[in-house]
């Protein structure tokens, strides 16, 4: 079963790639006092972030302004189908939500993205997302017939995001938000999603080198999706092997129980499926659809760690658990200070 149900969930799986970075660091440990005192005396030479000089004067060690990350992200997520409308060969679509029953729908993804970012302010980071990947979607149909399929797809993703970061004593906070689109050829238009995450953590600095540090955190992740997906797919893409083991009498009995408008569309599709199973070419037969869906659980917990080797290189990892979503992220970030101020 290719397209109609499976492709609708591809976009959900690349939308969770978020950006996160600590904007500022400070420590009361007397071991680091000479280092932070030197920051207070330094004339911050770079254009960005804005207010960077003031941050140094207050003793905050801020990241270099410009960065680029390579990110690997994998996720498993459950999807709930709320309603479905179907048409055939351009006919008016009819609501079959009360007559088709889906079982569990589970999507697994592997995504690879590049994320350029800029600290505009010591506490404000903006970034872009561009990448792609693959996903495996498991869809099961319970009624009118039992049917399961596993499909694999490729998709491209792009988006924009913003992170607010700060600290309260030894505890740092980061609030990340992004709006992401996933483009799959089989879907009429890119699928948007809004992602938000809040992290609370602590940074442990190297005893001898303040620019080295280990950060750990916990938090919560939230995702909101565009509910409706609309498109049109060839019947042979949706049911490439339909007819092998399927009983058309059962489908006829089911369609006989439908209201007239729904029965007309269902019989048209069943007729085409039966012709296809008998070897008749049905390449021009298309199914139009309008699907409403949602993530089964919009919230899940996240736990992560970050090791800063120096001011240039940062390695970050994060694990998402609980809810009906699990995820793992690995992020390597490289940073440069950027342009100096004109004297």
PLM region spans:
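Short loop/turn motifs that connect adjacent beta-strands in outer-membrane beta-barrel proteins
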Residues: 23-25, 55-66, 118-123, 167-173, ...
């Amino acid at each position: 079963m290719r397209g109609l149900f499976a492709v609708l969930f591809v976009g959900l799986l690349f939308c969770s790639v978020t950006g996160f970075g600590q904007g500022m660091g400070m420590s009361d440990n007397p071991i680091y006092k000479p280092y932070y005192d030197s920051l207070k005396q330094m004339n911050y030479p770079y254009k960005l972030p804005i207010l960077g000089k003031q941050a140094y004067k207050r003793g905050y060690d801020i990241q270099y302004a410009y960065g680029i990350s390579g990110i690997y992200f994998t996720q498993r997520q459950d999807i709930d189908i709320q309603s479905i409308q179907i048409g055939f060969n351009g006919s008016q679509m009819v609501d079959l939500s009360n007559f088709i029953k889906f079982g569990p729908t589970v999507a697994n993804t592997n995504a690879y993205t590049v994320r350029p970012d800029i600290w505009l302010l010591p506490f404000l980071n903006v970034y872009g997302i561009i990448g792609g990947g693959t996903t495996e979607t498991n869809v099961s149909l319970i009624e009118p017939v039992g049917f399961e399929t596993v499909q694999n797809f490729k998709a491209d993703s792009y988006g924009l995001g913003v992170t607010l970061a700060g600290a309260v004593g030894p505890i740092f906070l980061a609030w990340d938000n992004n709006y992401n689109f996933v483009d799959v050829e089989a879907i009429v238009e890119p699928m948007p999603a809004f992602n938000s995450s809040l992290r609370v953590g602590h940074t442990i600095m190297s005893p001898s080198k303040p620019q080295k540090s280990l950060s750990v955190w916990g938090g919560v992740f939230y995702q909101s999706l565009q509910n409706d997906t609309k498109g049109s797919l060839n019947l042979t893409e949706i049911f490439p092997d339909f007819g092998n083991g399927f009983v058309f009498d059962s489908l006829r009995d089911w369609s006989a129980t439908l209201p007239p408008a729904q029965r007309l569309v269902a019989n048209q599709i069943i007729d085409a499926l039966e012709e296809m199973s008998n070897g008749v070419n049905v390449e021009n037969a298309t199914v139009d659809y309008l699907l409403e869906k949602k993530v089964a659980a919009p919230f899940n917990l996240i736990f992560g760690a970050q090791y800063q080797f120096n001011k240039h290189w940062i390695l970050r990892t994060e694990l998402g658990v609980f809810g009906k979503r699990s995820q793992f992220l690995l992020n390597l970030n490289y940073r440069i200070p950027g342009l100096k101020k004109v004297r």
